[in-house]
Amino acid sequence: MIIHSDWHIHSEASYDSRLPIKEIEEKSLEYGFKKIGITDHLNFNDEKFVGDLKRSRELLSNLQKHCDRAVFGVELTPIEKPMFDYIKKHGNYEGYIAPVSQNPYEIELAMTKDELRALGVRYAIGASHWRVDVTGGKELGDDLNACIKEWYRQQMWLVSDERVTVLGHPWYNGRGLWYEDFSIIPRAMKDELRAALLENKKYAECNSHFFNSTLTGEKFRHQYAEFLRELFEAGIPITYGSDSHNSYKPAHVNTEKYLLEVGFADGDIKGIEECDLW
């Protein structure tokens, strides 16, 4: 066993999860995890998502009364700055119309670091999920080259932001656009992202999705494990995230198989150090 903690778990407080906090506690103990990080989504700065985060905090507070393995985190995703500003003014995004722009929209995250800390959050996973460079980016997810360019832009932005502790699921794509062959992502982009992670002293996540999803085949899984190994050998600490949503399965078992094949050993997959928690 080389994975001893899980820093990316979604509880029943997340809009897209039904995973009871009790199941997380019991299963993580069964798996031998020394630390578990609850990282429910804070996609937008609206009342709904802020309310979800407060519920997550309440669940964690109750859990921490008898479980010292649990850490309160959050998952942040890049959103377009004009939408952030609109929500800040109106409280939600109903009626929002994206402005016409010839350039990619500026990026923002839903809360400041001080706001997150005030709620008790101790670390943040920053992760790309959809395009925010153009109007209707969520619906424009099939343009391979545009998506690669936008994911690169977002991830480079995330690793330079003070709120991000861990770069979550690097190069994840919900539609699996480049999942047949990871070499589709230009080598220069991978190299520059690695350099930025190192320069900004960020963690990179080994997400179980890449090794367990039906979207990924054997070729991609081996390529992705090698990518993680390159990050590790460059001096970037690697955390593990199951990214569990609706059930807490032992996804780490299959994930470890691919990590071991590229040279990962016990002690290589890290937890977040206390000095890096808020």
Question: What residue ranges belong to the model's regions?
Answer:
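Divalent metal-binding pocket/active-site signature
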Residues: 18, 119-196, 200-218
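A metal-dependent hydrolase metal-coordination microenvironment
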Residues: 2-153, 241, 245-249, 258
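A generic structural signal for alpha->beta connector loops
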Residues: 67-69, 121, 163-164, 201, ...
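Charged catalytic cores and adjacent phosphate/nucleic-acid-binding surfaces used
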Residues: 1-11, 17, 21, 141, ...
